[in-house]
Structures are given as C-alpha cells and as structure tokens.
C-alpha cells in the first residue's frame, strides 16, 4: 500500500529535531509498503497528492496544532479517496476527534505495532475494526478497541527510517540528529502528558529503556551515513537510571561525538553524574526549572525540588563546563505576575545559557487540564483556536499583556541581567511584536552556541530558509495566537471537488471525564488536596 505521512516537520520549533515518530512508523511498515511524506507548508499538497495517489494518509496530532490537520484532511477528502488515520498525544487523550468529518480512524497510545498491523490488515482486505489501539468509524457507529499491552522490549523496534527525509535538505544537511533511548517517565507532574499516559497503561511497566549497545549501534549508523556531530537525546528523563547512564557515557565517549540530552531531571543530578556526562563530551543539556516559587512547584506542578537543589545543579554544570538551558512555565493557575518574576529571578541565580519560557497550556489527559476546567479558566472549545503555546495562552489569566511580554523577554533578561531592574516597566509596554522579533533573533544566536560545531555556509542558509518558511509558528504570526489564516498553510489552495461519500452516523459521546468546575477559584493548597500524586518506581538507580 502507499502510505503518506503529512506533517509540518519543518516547524521552526523543531529545527535540529528529527520527526522520530514518523521515522519509526515508517520503519515498521516500509519492508512491505511504500512510504511518502509531505511537508504541507513548504510543498504544493495538491500536486504531491496527484503524484502519489496514497491509499492511506496518517497524521500525528498535538494539541494546538490539531485543527490544522483536521481541516486539511477534510479538504483532501473532498477531492481524493483514501483512509485517514489520526494518532498522536491529542488523539490519545481526546478521542472525540473521531467525530470530526473526514476522520476515518484514530490510533491511541504507542502505535508501533498497532499501525503496522492496521496497514497489513487493510491491504489484505481484513477486518480493520478489530485492530487494537484503533477506533474505526463505520456505517453503523464507531468501533472502539482497547489498547494492546506496551512493548517492554524497545530493542525490538526498528531504528527510525531517516532515509524517507533524504530529499529534504533541511533535515539531512545538519550534523545534529535526534535519538531516544527510553520511553515513559515515573514522575507525575500535573502539566505533563506522562501522568495520563501511564494511568492509561496502569499495571504495566511504563518506563522502559533500550539497551546501551542498541543505542550505540544506531548512533554509529547515523554517524557514518549523515556525518553526525551532535546527538540530541529526547528522553523524558535521560538521567533516571544511574547504572544505564554510567554505561552509556562510557561507551558514548568512544564515538567522538557531542552529547545533548534535553530531558534531564535536576533533582537527580549529582557531581558523579555530571562527571560521567562530561566524559561523554556532553556540551549542553536542558532541565526543567518550571517555577521560581517552591510552593507553586510543589503544590501545583508536583515538582518536589528546592531552589537550593536547582542552584546546586546549575553550579555543578558550570563547574564542569557543561552548558545548560532551563524550561519555565509562566501564568500557572493560582499564580500571580510576581510568581513569574520570581521564576526569572531564580533563573538569574542559576545563570543558564538560555531560559525558555512558555505560557501554561492545559493539555488533555493532564491533571492541569482538569484543574483549569474545574476553575473555569479553560473551555474545551478553546482547543480549536489554540496555536502556539510559546506565544499565547488560552487560559483566563490576569496581567495577560505583562505575562506575554515577559515570555518574550525572559531569555534576553537572563543574558543581560541589568534589565531585570527594569522588567516591570518593560513588560507594560505595548511592544509585543518587537519583543517577539528580538526573542527569535536571540534564540537563533544562542542556538549556535548551545550546539557548537562547525557549520557550512550552505547549512546556515538552509536553516535560515527553514526558519523563514515555518509560517505557522513564524514570529510574524505570533502577534495573534488565534490567526486562523496562519494555520491554514498552503493547503488553502486545494480545490474542492465533489466525490461520493458514505453517510456515516457520528456517535457523540464524552470520553473525557471533566470534573464540575468550582464556583470560586482554587487556592494552590486546595489543588494539592484535590489531585493525588502517585508513587513511582524509578527502576534501576
């Protein structure tokens, strides 16, 4: 069968980040089927569709970008015949997507085995309504299948098929590529999808790791084929297992590569771990600071780590010459502008190379989603106008202008600390477009320092071109997070024609349990009582 993946993998937020999900799914089906990809913002979708004539089109949905793909799929359905498959985190936690016109099937949870089985059964003319993980829309209703058990042996999964992107210079010219060595996270942060995902697989081993040798083998292959210089690891908690980390660092150090893990837990870091990372030529890493207020971290975000531990982690990294960036969340429910400025102040004490700040977004499946709905701060319909969580928030928040300006100035103030004394004045100015431009320029500059290797002029040009053409998340479209035209991309040029369609009844059923919202706002102490954190087994330590 001809299977087409449509994905905006040239999104500027994903520069130097490979679309591993698509690559893995391509790897599991490519031995039997033909695989194609389309980047809908850069390419003429209609022309590519006419050339490929796919049997299946697959989309991976993230909350905030889901509407783009649903609308694009509907336009394609009016001109072409194919089976549409929607997967990804948004579908896993918000399966009512199946009710959307043009959506034929959804795939929930980890899709490696399920996707391959579905494509095989479809080609053979079998019963696709019996494939686990899939919900299928039929003439008589929606067939809902349970999820299959998690694959406990990650070494059995084929290496990501990077060759399907060889025609895209933006992906293959860089000497930086993404890898993942584990799946799952034992922590239960209220804003993270891992809490909801782990509960949906209750009773199973959610945190799993590839063997070190399996990871090293993949690294060697990519280094030989793509002249790899820096390996980015996208694990949720890269330093969870001390035993695994020590072995990995020892073997990685022999590859003559640079290491950049983007999911490090500060509370697990000690000097011994930092020494291992340094030996492995770790040039930079990212850890979540999230909030500069301990009570907010502990009671609202369920991040039980002290300011002192954050500062100590930063001190150890600086001592051993490892650059680092922090991730931060602004506009947390029950927080004030003062709390957000505390977050900036703690970053100034930690002195990261870059401090990324995002505005809180309540994603389906997270505890934060239930909290914000219950407080009346968020309505489900707001998902459809949510676009870029780095630029805006759909929560009902106080001091919106100041907080959105703070988000854009956050990293710049960390780099130029003298601005901190003027921050309250600066964030009151109606200069959001200017701040957005300054932030993106600064971010590009820091990115070069954060991933140090010798780039060719051609690579600089290609990366710049990728940045400019990422229209849906470009700074010029960040001025209004609800700009519908900005999300439509080149798909708007698709000409609609009438084709015979089956009349399929839609089952309107709420699969998302949403508590009743409170009539009064919750205090942070109430939230801690309202949502119970679960214990976890961190595995081999």
Residue ranges, per PLM feature:
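Short, solvent-exposed turn/loop segments enriched in Gly/Ser/Thr/Pro and often Arg
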Residues: 62, 90, 234-241, 264-266, ...
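Radical SAM [4Fe-4S] cluster-binding motif and immediate context
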Residues: 155, 159-325, 345
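Flexible glycine/acidic-rich beta-alpha junction loops that bind and position SAM and/or redox cofactors
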Residues: 12-13, 95, 187, 295, ...
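Catalytic cores of alpha/beta
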Residues: 95-100, 334-348
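A short, glycine/small-residue-rich beta-strand->loop->alpha-helix junction that serves as a flexible
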Residues: 10-20, 61-66
């Amino acid at each position: 069968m001809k299977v087409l993946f449509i994905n905006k993998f040239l999104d500027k937020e994903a520069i130097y980040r490979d679309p591993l999900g698509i690559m893995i799914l391509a790897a599991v089906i490519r031995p039997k089927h033909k695989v194609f990809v389309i980047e809908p913002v850069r390419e003429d979708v209609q022309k590519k569709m006419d050339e490929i004539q796919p049997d299946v089109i697959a989309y991976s949905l993230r909350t905030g970008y889901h509407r783009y793909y649903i609308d694009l799929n509907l336009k394609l359905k009016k001109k072409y015949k194919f089976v549409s498959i929607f997967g990804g985190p948004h579908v896993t936690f918000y399966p009512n997507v199946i009710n959307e016109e043009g959506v034929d099937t959804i795939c929930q949870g980890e899709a490696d085995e399920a996707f391959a089985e579905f494509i095989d059964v479809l080609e053979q003319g079998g019963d696709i309504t019996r494939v686990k993980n899939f919900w299928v829309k039929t003439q008589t209703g929606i067939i809902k299948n349970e999820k299959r058990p998690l694959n406990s042996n990650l070494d059995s999964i084929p290496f990501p098929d990077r060759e399907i992107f060889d025609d895209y210079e933006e992906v293959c010219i860089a000497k930086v590529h993404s890898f993942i060595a584990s799946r799952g996270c034992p922590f239960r942060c209220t804003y993270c999808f891992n809490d909801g995902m782990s509960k949906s697989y209750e009773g199973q081993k959610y945190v799993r790791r590839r063997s070190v040798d399996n990871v090293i083998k993949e690294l060697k292959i990519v280094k030989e084929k793509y002249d790899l210089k820096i390996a980015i690891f996208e694990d949720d908690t890269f330093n969870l297992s001390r035993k695994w980390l020590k072995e990995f660092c020892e073997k990685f150090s022999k590859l003559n590569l640079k290491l950049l893990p983007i999911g490090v837990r500060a509370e697990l870091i000690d000097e011994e771990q930092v020494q291992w990372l340094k030996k492995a030529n770790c040039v930079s890493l990212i850890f979540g600071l999230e909030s500069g207020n301990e009570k907010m971290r502990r009671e609202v975000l369920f991040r039980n780590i002290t300011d002192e531990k954050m500062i100590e982690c930063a001190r150890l990294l600086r001592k051993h010459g490892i650059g680092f960036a922090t991730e931060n969340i602004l506009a947390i429910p029950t927080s004030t502008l003062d709390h957000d400025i505390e977050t900036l102040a703690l970053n100034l004490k930690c002195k990261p190379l870059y401090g990324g700040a995002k505005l809180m977004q309540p994603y389906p499946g997270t505890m934060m989603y239930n909290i914000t709905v219950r407080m009346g701060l968020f309505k489900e319909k707001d998902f459809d106008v949510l676009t870029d969580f780095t630029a805006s928030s759909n929560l009902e928040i106080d001091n919106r202008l100041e907080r959105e300006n703070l988000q854009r100035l956050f990293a710049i103030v960390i780099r130029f600390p003298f601005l901190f004394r003027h921050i309250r004045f600066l964030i009151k100015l109606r200069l959001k477009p200017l701040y957005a431009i300054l932030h993106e320029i600064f971010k590009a500059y820091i990115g070069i320092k954060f991933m140090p290797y010798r780039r060719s002029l051609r690579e600089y040009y290609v990366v710049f071109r990728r940045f400019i053409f990422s229209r849906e998340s470009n700074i010029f479209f960040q001025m209004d997070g609800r700009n519908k035209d900005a999300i439509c991309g080149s798909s708007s040029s698709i000409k609609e024609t009438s084709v015979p369609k089956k009349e399929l009844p839609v089952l309107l059923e709420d699969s998302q349990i949403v508590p009743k919202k409170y009539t009064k706002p919750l205090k942070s102490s109430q939230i801690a009582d309202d949502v119970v954190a679960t214990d976890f087994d961190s595995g081999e330590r």
